[in-house]
Amino acid sequence: MISIAALLLTRALPACAGGREIADPSGGNPLFGMAQQMANFVYLVADAATKQAAVVDACWDCAGVAKIAEGLGLTITGALYTHKHFDHGGGAVPERMATGPGGSKIMLEGAQTMAALGAEVFVCAADGPDLASATGLAAVTPLEEGTVL
């Protein structure tokens, strides 16, 4: 399972509890076993006053992340990615790790799905072009050290 931790920047939301599991095997994701082995973490950071949230490294189960946010009454307006690797930002899974039916590439949803859900996508400037290319996005918002969001 992949854990999603919730950290609220102002006063805590009563319904919020850290450590929720996403990437549920009942969802039929062919990559569930890999997701479980990689033990990636996703963080949902929210402002309790505005109910706006940003998600960090949402990749394996974006629908699960969105469902948790919705259940907390939050609107995800930003998706921040720590780096360009497929298991953080999405894109094609390396062939040596997994291929789909008929040898087709398996894609992780990641940044592309979060953008489709209305979130602005952020990543460090050096990884921006690669993440955009890997996920099919026209562009992502670059972050430099010291950027204030």
Predicted features along the sequence, with ranges:
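Active-site HxH/HxHxD metal-binding segment of metal-dependent hydrolases
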Residues: 38-39, 61-149
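Zn-dependent metallo-beta-lactamase
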Residues: 1-72
